[in-house]
Amino acid sequence: MLKNTLLPILFIFSSTIYAQKIDKTKDELKSGKPVDTRPPLPTEPVNQSSPSTVRESNDSFGIGGFFVEFGFYITLYAGIGDYRNEDHLYYPLSPYPYFDGKTGNYEKIDDESVLKKQLRFDLENHFLYSNNASFGNHLKGKFRPFQYLYLQTDYRELMERDKFSKTNSNLSLFQFNLGYDRLRFEKFNLGWTLGATYIANDINKAGFSYGLNTDVFAFKKVSFNSAMIWSKINGLSVNSFEFRGKYHKKNHFFSMGYENLKMGSPSYNYATFGAGIYF
């Protein structure tokens, strides 16, 4: 008897908690972090530069400049690569993964591949499911004018249902990014993205974003994809992580995976089911 009574109570309580996540995210992103504008207390140190400190800074400027320049070239190599010595950076786009039964997003250069069309458009859609009270949709488009750079847009619409109060909450998350694949091999590619994250509804705020992503073409017709994007909106983290496996069939695929969104303090976890096509 007690068990039969507790189960409905726990179900209603869990549904209410999930429905409060979106509202909590909205409230936090609207208000942001409190800014400490008070003057320093007498016991707090105040940063002041003495003349000797200024002279030491001037003396060390030359050494510091050397390390800054050195760090710049290291960063340039790590992020962009060496086009004089890394042949894979010239690998052309494939028409779609596994078009020849073995190649992923990029194929090795030969006399025929150089002449092939480089333009490609990737479109995919995924249903997001956490429970009966929390679900959503993730639409992603990737425009590849050539093998060097691409433009990517992600649109997530999240829904939460409060069965106790019979109300619904929704949140629209947009990510706009410029992408670059640093490593471009037949079976593996790794790259980064730079762009902006925007949350609509009654928040209407945006922030700078950066991310990493990779594709592994493990064996015939199957690949694995992972992507992470970090951003801040109104001083609070708005991050996304996704991992999914894809089964490819000609120029389309079916997928299953997992997504996590961290927006403010709430964290959202979803199983994903979807499909995509390459044009």
How would you describe each model-predicted region?
Residues 80-84, 105-111, 145-147, 179-184, ...:
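Outer-membrane beta-barrel proteins
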Residues 135-136, 209, 238-240:
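Short, surface-exposed coil-to-beta transition loops
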Residues 184-185, 202-204, 214-218:
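Short, conserved, surface-exposed binding loops centered on an aromatic residue
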Residues 92-176, 185, 189:
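Eukaryote-specific, low-hydrophobicity, charge-rich regions
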Residues 208-226:
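Short helix-loop boundary/capping segments
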Residues 1-111:
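Cleavable N-terminal export/targeting peptides
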Residues 155-176, 181, 192-205, 230-279:
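Outer-membrane beta-barrel translocator/channel fold
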Residues 147-153, 185-190, 220-226, 247-256:
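Repeated loop/turn-to-beta-strand initiation elements of outer-membrane beta-barrel proteins
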